[in-house]
Amino acid sequence: MIKDTPFDINALKAKRRYEINKGKKNFDVKRIRPSEHRDELYEVLMAAYQGWPEKYRPTVNEEKFKNSINSWGDLIVYGGFDKVEGKLCAFSYLKEYPNYLEFSVLRARPDSERSGINATMVVAILEDYNERLGKAFYINDGERAIRHETAFQDYLEKYFGFRKAYCRLNIQYQWWVKAIVKTIWPFRKIFVANNKIGSIISSVMKMEECCKNKQN
């Protein structure tokens, strides 16, 4: 999913403009130094994960996460702050390359999403890069979600003009993994993604199906 054209809020329907402007009234978004917000970043991350289904909710070690922030030096990090309380409600980090920006992560407190935090975060990023979009530069939100049940890419497409850039999926298995996949492939429909193991197996089967469909 990519954004390779300038963003124009005036081209949106009135309802979508309202949602974006609502978020701007409630939150300030700016680039931050993550080392100055370790505790808040961890709190936002954990609040966001609590809203995920347990079957693929990650387990996060607080100390390891806070220490990992030391390695964010080459990332561009945005923070979304509540205008009333000044509390960090969302963060996003991205990595910039010569021809594109990798939209890696966006995490938000669920109770802030109703007030438009996600829209405000995305708009702030688009506005910062708007002059470069369409000039051999684009924002990449990554591949289609397989394991994670999310409508975020649909949201980016509908509200912000992102588009699907189709590509071919190729998978290189280790020999023993390939043997397992081949063995369980005929029984793939019995694997239900209702726990962590089932979710992983179901995801592999979905990717294998994508590969087979492209070959036919």
Language-model features, listed with the residues they occupy:
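A conserved beta-strand-loop-helix scaffold within acyl/acetyltransferase catalytic domains
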Residues: 2-20, 24-113, 123, 128-130
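Active-site/acyl-donor-binding loops of N-acyltransferases
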Residues: 1-7, 132, 136-216
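Hydrophobic transmembrane alpha-helix bundles
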Residues: 13-17, 67-77, 91-102, 119, ...
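Glycine/small-residue-rich hydrophobic helix-like segments
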Residues: 97-159
